[in-house]
């Protein structure tokens, strides 16, 4: 009997069976080891985002901000964890894993109802706080999964159309850890345009507050003004306002002007531009070389921005419609430096009813001037000025309001109009960088082979094909045995 058993183990089939059992055991051991190793990896490494539009992805802007985070931040989540939307839970886990300065605590409002009252928030809210600064900011789940209000009014039901987890979290962390808040005053009384919701949200995400000012009524620029903004005025400023603006700039102030359409001449505004090395060309600009589908007044400017103005620009695709042109000239003082950051090609024309002037035109420019303490000792434009400080006055000009027009920025979401605009705004502040992240669309896109990623192709075709080939080779080898 014993000899029969020994003999059976010497047979070819027995050897093959033993080999198979050994291989299975080895594979099982390898799988266990790999899973143990994978379990120790950080959340941001072991999770792969296969969602449409990469909603779980974290941009370079946020990663830089989190890498520089030097204060401890706490996420207190007042919600039932099991019933929380999976997208929110997954993103919280991935985002907070990027910094060891962030701690997360879930508080169940059903088990601890008094916690909501104590915190002064509703359920499904994340309270982000920093103990060092004593600041807190609340982010509702509704701010993360943004519903389509238009769909609600047209169909009676609404669903999430955007995912804004990254934008809300990075903004909140920036807000609670920052020691200073910058304030923007926008002028009224000249038929100015109003900021779109998209621009207002980006201001808020960058911890910038806004308020209006009528310079004709006040006769001065507010003491707490960090940036004076004039958005596409349709009327000229008065002589007094011109003097006010020029004096403000000469004392180290910051002014941002977006040119508008005016039926009348604007000599006073033109004098402000001229003093800082800019002159408005007549008519509208048509670009024969860099236009949108042959419409020469729909221009893709050449972006020549550098440093902070070029922060996180990838495609450098900006669209401007019916733009006025600027011509750089010699400024009034040698201490003023004027630099263009948006230009047309050299095959462009300033078009009026009477003529067409060919040339290269500037569509966005910045003029700066170093101001000594003697020149600005009575200035109220900077909150942190000192008697021995040297300030930098800054005049930023963009030649068309279409740069931030919601009809363009909301329609062509891949353009970088708002990214460049916010860079131009935050460049006016020493301690503020553009960390505003736009919400990501949740619209479903058809995944055709033309756009399939390499991971999808390998998963769907590559791995099964390798298994089939290996199985066929094993079968063929055994068949020959």
Residue ranges and their predicted role:
Residues 2-481:
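Short, surface-exposed patches at the edges or C-terminal ends of soluble domains, predominantly
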């Amino acid at each position: 009997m014993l000899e029969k058993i020994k003999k059976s183990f010497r047979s070819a089939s027995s050897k093959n069976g033993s080999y198979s059992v050994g291989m299975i055991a080895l594979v099982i051991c390898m799988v266990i080891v790999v899973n143990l190793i994978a379990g120790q990896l950080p959340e941001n490494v072991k999770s792969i985002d296969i969602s449409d539009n990469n909603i779980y992805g974290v941009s370079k802007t946020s990663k830089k901000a989190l890498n520089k985070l030097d204060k401890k931040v706490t996420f207190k989540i007042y919600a039932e964890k099991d019933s929380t939307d999976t997208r929110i839970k997954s993103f919280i886990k991935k985002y907070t894993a990027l910094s060891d300065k962030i701690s997360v605590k879930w508080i169940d409002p059903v088990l601890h109802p008094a916690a909501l009252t104590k915190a002064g928030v509703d359920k499904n809210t994340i309270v982000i706080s920093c103990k060092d600064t004593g600041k807190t900011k609340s982010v509702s789940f509704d701010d993360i999964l943004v519903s389509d209000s238009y769909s609600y009014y047209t169909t009676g039901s609404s669903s999430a159309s955007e995912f804004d987890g990254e934008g809300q979290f990075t903004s909140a962390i920036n807000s609670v850890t920052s020691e200073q808040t910058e304030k923007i005053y926008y002028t009224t009384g000249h038929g100015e345009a109003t900021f779109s919701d998209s621009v207002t949200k980006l201001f808020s995400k960058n911890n910038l507050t806004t308020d209006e000012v009528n310079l004709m009524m006040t006769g001065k620029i507010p003491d707490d003004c960090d940036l004076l903004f004039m958005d596409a005025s349709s009327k000229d400023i008065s002589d007094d306002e011109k003097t006010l603006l020029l004096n403000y700039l000469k004392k180290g102030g910051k002014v941002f002007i977006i040119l508008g359409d005016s039926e009348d001449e604007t000599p006073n505004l033109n004098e402000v531009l001229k003093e800082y090395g800019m002159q408005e060309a007549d008519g509208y600009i048509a670009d024969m070389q860099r236009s949108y589908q042959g419409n020469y007044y729909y221009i893709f400017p050449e972006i020549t921005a550098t440093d902070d103005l070029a922060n996180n620009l990838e495609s450098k695709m900006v669209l401007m419609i019916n733009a006025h042109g600027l011509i750089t000239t010699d400024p009034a003082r040698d201490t003023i430096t004027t630099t263009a950051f948006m230009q047309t090609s050299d095959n462009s024309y300033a078009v009026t009813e009477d003529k067409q002037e060919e040339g290269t035109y500037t569509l966005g420019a910045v003029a700066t001037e170093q101001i000594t303490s003697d020149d600005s000792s009575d200035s109220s434009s900077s909150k942190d000025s000192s008697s021995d400080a040297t300030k930098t006055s800054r005049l930023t000009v963009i030649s068309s309001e279409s740069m931030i027009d919601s009809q363009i920025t909301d329609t062509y979401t891949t353009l970088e109009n708002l990214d460049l605009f916010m860079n131009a705004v935050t460049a006016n502040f020493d301690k503020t960088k553009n960390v505003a992240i736009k919400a990501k669309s949740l619209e479903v896109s058809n995944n055709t082979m033309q756009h399939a990623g390499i991971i999808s192709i390998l998963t769907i075709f590559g791995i099964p094909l390798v298994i089939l080939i290996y199985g066929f080779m094993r079968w063929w080898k055994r068949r020959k045995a």
